[in-house]
Amino acid sequence: MKWKEFIINETKQSYLKNIIKKINNIENHQVVFPLKKQRFRCFDFFDIEQTKVVILGQDPYHTPKIANGLCFSVDLGNNLPGSLINIFKALEYDLQIKRTNPDLSDWAKQGVLLLNTVLTVNAHQPNSHKNFGYEELIKNVFNELRKQKHVVYLLWGKQAMSYINLIDQKQNLILCASHPSPLSAHRGFLTCKHFSKCNDYLIKHLRTPIKW
């Protein structure tokens, strides 16, 4: 099954219908990011069984024209947010790759699910949709992923790590580190070497490594 089919099915469930209705009401008087057409974009790229890596973010960027539906990613032409700068620093430290393109859709096209734990946010109000009920969607995503094996989970920060018990730890690889935010990246994220560890695991299990 494609991830796109999965999310279409989820939008028919009452919990997600309620979330969407709540957001539609908010949009009568408030700007919400990302744009409506991009809110489920992370599910657009591949089949569920093609999932190689899951990167779990928090909520989308709340400044205008930044969030694009993929966690940590921004479109070309935008300034790099602090978290993405630190992700690229960690990548260079690990694999000596000097990445400058802030659009991570090339990762998504290789089977990297770039999923936020909360999929929407009010403009200039971080965590404003934190209690909207997205937890059920994330749990359903992880339930689908339990049918797969040899997937690498990159859990950055406490919010991402709170989902660790939903992962089959015997059949997959879980890599945890502090969040790449400028407030916490110095607590181990910058030197975690998750990118090489991820690819080593994929190669070991006869899966194509990610071109970071």
From Swiss-Prot:
Listed Pfam families: UDG (PF03167)
Catalytic activity: Hydrolyzes single-stranded DNA or mismatched double-stranded DNA and polynucleotides, releasing free uracil
Single Gene Ontology BP annotation: base-excision repair, AP site formation via deaminated base removal
GO CC, any one term: cytoplasm
Main subcellular location: cytoplasm
Cross-referenced InterPro entries: UDG_fam1, Ura-DNA_Glyclase_AS, Uracil-DNA_glycosylase-like, Uracil-DNA_glycosylase-like_sf
Active site: 59
One function term, GO molecular function aspect: uracil DNA N-glycosylase activity
Keyword Cytoplasm: yes
Keywords carried by this UniProt record: Cytoplasm, DNA damage, DNA repair, Hydrolase
Keyword DNA damage: yes
Signal peptide: none
SMART domains for this protein: UDG, UreE_C
Compartments reported by the entry: Cytoplasm
EC number(s) stated in the UniProt entry for this protein: 3.2.2.27
NCBIfam families: PRK05254.1-1, PRK05254.1-2, PRK05254.1-5, ung
Role of this protein: Excises uracil residues from the DNA which can arise as a result of misincorporation of dUMP residues by DNA polymerase or due to deamination of cytosine.
Family designation: Belongs to the uracil-DNA glycosylase (UDG) superfamily. UNG family.
Name assigned to this protein: Uracil-DNA glycosylase
